[in-house]
Amino acid sequence: VNLSYRQQVARNHTATHLMHKALQVVLGESAKQAGSLVNAQGLRFDFSYPKAMIKEQLEKVEQIVNEKILENIPVVTHDKVEIEKAKNMGAMAMFGEKYDEHVRVLQVDNFSLELCGGTHVQASGEIGTFKIISEGSVTSGVRRIEAITGTKVLEYIKGINETMTQASNELKCSRNEIVAKITALKDKIKSQEQSVTALQSKLAQNKLSDLLANSTQVKDIQIVIENLNEISVSELEILCDK
């Protein structure tokens, strides 16, 4: 087995346990696992919750997990524990797992206690760091979080830095000025669009005057026959409104 691959899977697996508990701390104990996927690329965790998590909640979950990582807590496994004893200890069961009469219990200090037979790190510090990438809906009442750990977080940050550098170069400003620059450009575009709309309205009014001057009166109805191919759709809409 590739050691690097196994190590990254272990990071993501232990991080899944930490995040599960962190979700319950932030959202309440009703936030229970509804499915999960762990591989070397990252982790995916489905859990019961009736609505989208807000930014502050996601940040708090991230903070809790990273604090536990920095504490470098020993990750202890208790083998061949009777299933009833494990439940009495308060161990949470992972979704979709079938348990024998004797089970393996994974403990991260007094923070996380779950039944699990997978590969894990020996101490939380081995995870390195933890980053939530996305949070969304799977189905009614079930949310999904995707996250990364270890070297994948470094790759993620590198990608963001490259994008920021490219944006600052294109906008000809420092990174700290990017948001202000974009806001200024949006305001400028909005102002120009308003000017264009005003000009189109004025042109349409002039065109309307010309059309009415060349109209034909049939009883009480003014009839205008004109080829308007040179007029844009937006100008034509303004003209019709007149």
Where in the sequence are the language-model features?
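Non-catalytic interaction/regulatory segments
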Residues: 30, 41-138
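Extended hydrophobic-aromatic, low-complexity segments
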Residues: 8-12, 31-35, 54-58, 77, ...
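Feature representing long, continuous alpha-helical segments
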Residues: 16, 21, 25, 59, ...
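Terminal appendage regions of diverse proteins
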Residues: 30, 124-242
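A generic structural motif
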Residues: 3-7, 17, 49-53, 136, ...
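Active/ligand-binding-proximal structured segments within catalytic/core domains
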Residues: 1-47
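Short, hydrophobic beta-strand segments
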Residues: 2-5, 42-52, 147, 218-230
